[in-house]
Amino acid sequence: MSITTERKQQLIKEYAITENDTGSSAVQCAILTERINNLTEHFKSNHKDHASRRGLLILVGRRRRLLNYIKKNNISEYLELISKLGIRKVK
């Protein structure tokens, strides 16, 4: 259910701006998206897990705020990121 260290390192390599970049907004959005996707799969078999559903909503809100920040500062980076992650635009 949780994201593995290897998968996190792979996401950091893929979305990092520089080699040692682990905290940029794009990297954080990619990691949050992976966690959200894992929780979504979890809910397919555990639909009554309401405590985890609250955690999912918190993660989605955190990702939405990060995407709003990226959209406000660099619209081209935002459009590229949402297409790579396969998510819809933030309203």
From Swiss-Prot:
Does the entry feature the keyword Transmembrane, yes or no?
Answer: no
MF terms from GO for this chain are: rRNA binding; structural constituent of ribosome
Q: Which Gene3D superfamilies match?
A: 6.10.250.3130, S15/NS1, RNA-binding
GO CC: one term? cytosolic small ribosomal subunit
What the entry lists under SMART domains is as follows: Ribosomal_S15 (SM01387)
Tell me, what is an example of a GO biological process annotation in this record?
translation
Under the heading PROSITE patterns, the entry gives: RIBOSOMAL_S15
Keyword line: Ribonucleoprotein, Ribosomal protein, RNA-binding, rRNA-binding
Is Iron-sulfur among this UniProt entry's keywords? no
Q: What does UniProt give as the signal peptide span?
A: none
Look up the domain of life of the source: Bacteria
Belongs to which family? Belongs to the universal ribosomal protein uS15 family.
Function text: One of the primary rRNA binding proteins, it binds directly to 16S rRNA where it helps nucleate assembly of the platform of the 30S subunit by binding and bridging several RNA helices of the 16S rRNA. Forms an intersubunit bridge (bridge B4) with the 23S rRNA of the 50S subunit in the ribosome.
Assembly with partners or alone: Part of the 30S ribosomal subunit. Forms a bridge to the 50S subunit in the 70S ribosome, contacting the 23S rRNA.
Write the protein's name: Small ribosomal subunit protein uS15
Which organism does this sequence originate in? Rickettsia canadensis (strain McKiel)
List the top taxonomic levels of the source: Bacteria, Pseudomonadati, Pseudomonadota, Alphaproteobacteria, Rickettsiales
